[in-house]
Amino acid sequence: MTNKLLALLLPDALTIAQIAEAKKPRQIPDWYPDKDSLYRAVESIPPFGIYKDNYIVTGTSFSGGRVTKDNSDAKFQISLRHRLIKSILPLHTYLFLTYTQKSFWEIYKDSKPFYENNYNPTLGFGMPITRGDKVVGVGFLQFEHESNGRDSIWSRSWNRITLQAIYEIDPHFTVQAKFWIPFALSDNPHIVRYAGYGQVAGTYKTRNERFRFSMLVVKRGGWNLNANFQMDAAFRLSKISNQYIYLQYYNGYAESMIDYDRFHSYLRIGFAIKPKHFSIF
């Protein structure tokens, strides 16, 4: 009789225990920085620094048949940020300006011309994402302009209001999502069909940041499952530097503004200078 009674009561007892356990406040891991230390760190770091990855790579296309000087190139990116106001704004936000330039250089041709330059200045706010007294990520609200600086039929430009969140899952994995509202598309009204309305990315790094691997997925326009992909692998040259041997693979459209409606598949290798902790896409 006792055994039958236990059998009847045990599931309910387990359910009650599970509910009680679920109601307990979850402990936030200690490796997340606390808000006060982050605010002090922001005050102490220089207002000028690197923003996204800075790199120079060279490689060739897999979508143009055999390797030739016509489908091989060099690509480099320069990305900087500047905090415009030192003091903390309401809601613990920071006003900052960024500038990113991405260039495609046909170094294997005789005259070594620059094929395309894309300029991407932004103005926006950044703020920490918190849980309790810990900082678990960062968010951005920005106005972005991107163009190739040309005129006439070669002009390409668009403007966006972007919202981005970066969340650190644990010391190894970081995820981020970015969505935008495009406007002023008169130079290229169909660009969102190829560059989309948003992107997601994930990054894995070893605890000492010696190795990093990232994957970026940009959902193109439309309801079908189409996307642009970029995969990065980086190995740090020494334990005290932020310089990496860098491998990048791009597959999709809109790698450059001039060819936003042409498909490309490029594998390139070179060197990169990366921000500490995580890369911003």
Q: Which residues are covered by each model-predicted region?
A:
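Cleavable N-terminal export/targeting peptides
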Residues: 1-37, 278-281
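Outer-membrane beta-barrel "beta-signal"
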Residues: 264-281
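Long, low-hydrophobicity, solvent-exposed regions enriched in small/turn-prone and acidic residues
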Residues: 70-77, 83
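N-terminal regions that are enriched for targeting/export leaders
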Residues: 19-61
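Solvent-exposed residues in well-ordered beta-strands and their adjoining turns
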Residues: 83, 126, 236, 250, ...
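Long, compositionally biased interface segments
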Residues: 232-234, 240-246, 254-255, 263, ...
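Glycine/small-residue-rich hydrophobic helix-like segments
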Residues: 212-243
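Outer-membrane pore/translocation modules
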Residues: 21-22, 50-63, 70, 86-207, ...
